[in-house]
Each structure stands twice: as C-alpha cells, then as structure tokens.
C-alpha cells in the first residue's frame, strides 16, 4: 500500500477518520496571558498531540495571523491578542465551535 495503515483504527491512511473524530471530541481553551512589559500571548490549550500535529496547526495559525508563536507541551502560544480570530481559524480547520471556549 502507498499510504500504509493507521495504527489507531486499522484502516488504510486514505480512509482513516481518526483525526476528524479527535477534532470533534477535544475541549479547547483559548486564553490571553500577559507577559513581561505588558506583552500579550494567546494560548491554545486542550489539544491532544497524539491525534493532531501541533507543529502544522501552529504554522497554519502563525501564517494566517501574521504573528510569531511556538508549541510548548500540549499548547500553542501565539504572540498578541488573537482570541477571536483563533476561534474562527479552528472552526475552519474542522474543530467544533461548541468545544472552543
């Protein structure tokens, strides 16, 4: 097979829906923290790194928001206050808006 088999569900990679199911079930918390010198940082928590590639999601967010950021542990940190836009972008990526707070 070209794509291989998903280790979670056992289906071929082309038919695997594990990531979509994981997106619907996660409770995501978006908050803004103040750092040194009054700088604001948007923190996205509650993402499971085993089901979703946080680096790819972080890269997508940084590109759309035109800001810097990083992945720390199970969270994504973005420079600046982007709380409202992050919720919109997460819904575009397939996350349920009811599970984003």
Curated annotation (Swiss-Prot):
Pfam families: SUI1 (PF01253)
Database matches in Gene3D superfamilies: SUI1-like domain
Keywords: Protein biosynthesis, Translation regulation
GO MF term (any one): translation initiation factor activity
UniProt keyword annotation of Protein biosynthesis present: yes
Domain of life: Archaea
Entries under InterPro entries matching the protein: DENR/SUI1_TIF, SUI1, SUI1_arc, SUI1_arc_bac, SUI1_dom_sf
Biological process per Gene Ontology, one example term: translation reinitiation
Keyword Protein biosynthesis included in the entry's annotation: yes
Similarity field: Belongs to the SUI1 family.
Protein name from the UniProt record: Protein translation factor SUI1 homolog
Organism encoding this protein: Methanoregula boonei (strain DSM 21154 / JCM 14090 / 6A8)
């Amino acid at each position: 097979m070209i794509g291989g088999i998903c280790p979670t569900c056992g289906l071929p990679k082309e038919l695997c829906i594990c990531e979509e199911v994981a997106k619907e079930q996660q409770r995501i918390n978006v908050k803004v923290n103040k750092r040194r010198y009054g700088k604001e940082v948007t923190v996205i928590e509650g993402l499971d790194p085993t089901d979703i590639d946080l680096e790819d999601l972080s890269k997508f967010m940084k590109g759309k928001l035109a800001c810097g950021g990083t992945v720390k542990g199970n969270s994504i940190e973005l420079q600046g206050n982007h709380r409202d836009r992050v919720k919109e972008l997460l819904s575009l990526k397939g996350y349920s808006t009811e599970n984003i707070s």
